[in-house]
């Protein structure tokens, strides 16, 4: 066997060149058991809580339970291809999602992957899904209105930018319809309003049917509202970890706008299903159950999510994130565990009732039980001026209506109150997909509280309102513009508005 010097020197050179090169160390663990979307992993000693880990075949998971001898991992995807003895790799990254304007108009899953078939997302940066909420110093009190376009809400239960207003009610009471109308109502501002007033929308669908989400997206698309909206969908067929994560992912996407001096609205539809998904994960991870078998930290789950909605101060760019969480009750039971939790976290609630819905009062808002704890600071002055009296009148009407059932001979004052109340209730009805601008609402409610409806039969109120709006949009356009610009009803403007309504009332028959 002949030894060539050149070959030996080549081998030596190669070994010298690679001397001291570190091998890439990736920390791995082994699957001990897997089932129900949960894997128990041995190893991964230095894994962080909430860190992404990778299973064979590219399936991802998140380390949630860090125990003495193993790690409990929830799996984002099907667990049927994972088996005992499989290798699990750390990624070193806490769960994050893409953020930025590139997401507008898209439908994504809880990890920010597109699911609408429109190609990859053009996002520039990624942010962690679970970050700390802003403290007390960065915040500012809520003072700008977030218009929903619904008279019953904007007049009586006003929502401000940076507020958290709960939408609560039984199934099929129109909770999603309120969210949808609020999103559609932002179209006019996006089309011709100033940049600083635009409101970007994020809609998080948790545990809903795919057909429902597809229908929701279709309506947004047809009405031109998808271009300023992001849809995060974790449907009923998605694993529980995805349903648990979706609200946090959506919140991170909304925070991008808040932190860059813009305004965003996020709705979680609905948080009851997120709590159920979290309960499922917690029980499978063998965490101790509490009331209604929910884990002890289910309050913290929702509070840390909803506290991220905030109005930031001037130094941080004046941005805001408004949250409209949805909770579904069973048989109008607001005193169950999750509803009471979320009511205590939010700044008010819009309470929807089945009876009202079937009576044809839609949106089915129970004005007596609904509150906004931010209140009139989230209204323009003009709306305060006209809506101040309507709340009192409706409260008196409800009280009197209860008594009126017992007695037939009512004095004239009571009769007047009942007449006015029934007409105001009629006035607050509104069909779906017809949100009104604030100045139009002011004109309509002004007519209601100043007695223009008192002589009309109740079934003519809707017709009168429709006619009045058409008249104001044509002949009274300058009055509406003045209300929008001045944001208050001066004596002069009040007289002009009165004159326009008088002119219309004469022609109405």
UniProtKB/Swiss-Prot annotation:
Produces ATP from ADP in the presence of a proton gradient across the membrane. The alpha chain is a regulatory subunit. ATP binds at residues 169-176. F-type ATPases have 2 components, CF(1) - the catalytic core - and CF(0) - the membrane proton channel. CF(1) has five subunits: alpha(3), beta(3), gamma(1), delta(1), epsilon(1). CF(0) has three main subunits: a(1), b(2) and c(9-12). The alpha and beta chains form an alternating ring which encloses part of the gamma chain. CF(1) is attached to CF(0) by a central stalk formed by the gamma and epsilon chains, while a peripheral stalk is formed by the delta and b chains. This is ATP synthase subunit alpha. It is found in: Cell inner membrane. InterPro entries: ATP_synth_asu-like_sf (IPR023366), ATP_synth_asu_C (IPR000793), ATP_synth_asu_C_sf (IPR038376), ATP_synth_F1_a_nt-bd_dom (IPR033732), ATP_synth_F1_asu (IPR005294), ATPase_a/bsu_AS (IPR020003), ATPase_F1/V1/A1_a/bsu_N (IPR004100), ATPase_F1/V1/A1_a/bsu_N_sf (IPR036121). It comes from the Bacteria. Keywords: ATP synthesis, ATP-binding, Cell inner membrane, Cell membrane, CF(1), Hydrogen ion transport, Ion transport, Membrane, Nucleotide-binding, Translocase, Transport. The keyword Transmembrane does not apply. It comes from Mesorhizobium japonicum (strain LMG 29417 / CECT 9101 / MAFF 303099) (Mesorhizobium loti (strain MAFF 303099)). It is an enzyme of class 7 (translocase). The record marks 370 as: Required for activity. GO terms for cellular component: plasma membrane; proton-transporting ATP synthase complex. It is a peripheral membrane protein. It catalyses: ATP + H2O + 4 H(+)(in) = ADP + phosphate + 5 H(+)(out).
